[in-house]
Regions:
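Primarily recognizes the serine-hydrolase "nucleophile elbow" in alpha/beta-hydrolase
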Residues: 75-143
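Serine-hydrolase catalytic machinery in alpha/beta-hydrolase-like enzymes
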Residues: 1-89
Length: 144
């Protein structure tokens, strides 16, 4: 479960966007900072969090990124921890974070816990293996 969030944007924003980091860079990396600041400048409230393996790196523990399926429950727990928002909640992330969000999006959308999905740099396949697509679950998605 995420220990803390980084927030950007107005507390009373009409839409909150929850973002998870990519496989190798934390929630406060240059690219995540830039994306959060740009979205906040448009009036969105941004809530960034880290998966457990990445948060552990802050205390010196180095673990490789787990499979996306492994951290799906952590994303759901982050939604729970964030709690009610002023308006609709959109989930997403950078690279692996966006992929994980996309993997839980339809169930969270069906449960009326989220209103949409935003992926920044979706990893369509593992590096150097374009034949191993990670897109099957995207076909027929119901989440906007």
């Amino acid at each position: 479960m995420p220990a803390s969030f980084l927030f950007d944007g107005p507390d009373d924003a009409r839409v909150t966007i929850m973002l998870a980091h990519g496989a190798g860079a934390p929630m406060d990396s240059a690219s995540m900072n830039a994306a959060a600041k740009a979205l906040a400048a448009e009036g969105f409230r941004i809530a960034r969090f880290e998966f457990g393996y990445m948060a552990a790196r802050r205390t010196g523990e180095r673990r490789p990124p787990p499979k996306a399926e492994t951290v799906m429950p952590e994303y759901v727990a982050a939604i729970d921890e964030l709690g009610p928002t002023n308006g609709p909640l959109v989930i997403g992330g950078k690279s692996m974070g966006g992929r994980v969000a996309s993997m839980i999006a339809d169930s969270e959308f069906a449960a009326k816990r989220i209103a949409g999905l935003l992926c920044l740099g979706y990893p369509f396949h593992p590096l150097g293996r374009p034949e191993q697509l990670r897109t099957r679950h995207l076909i027929g998605m119901k989440t906007p």
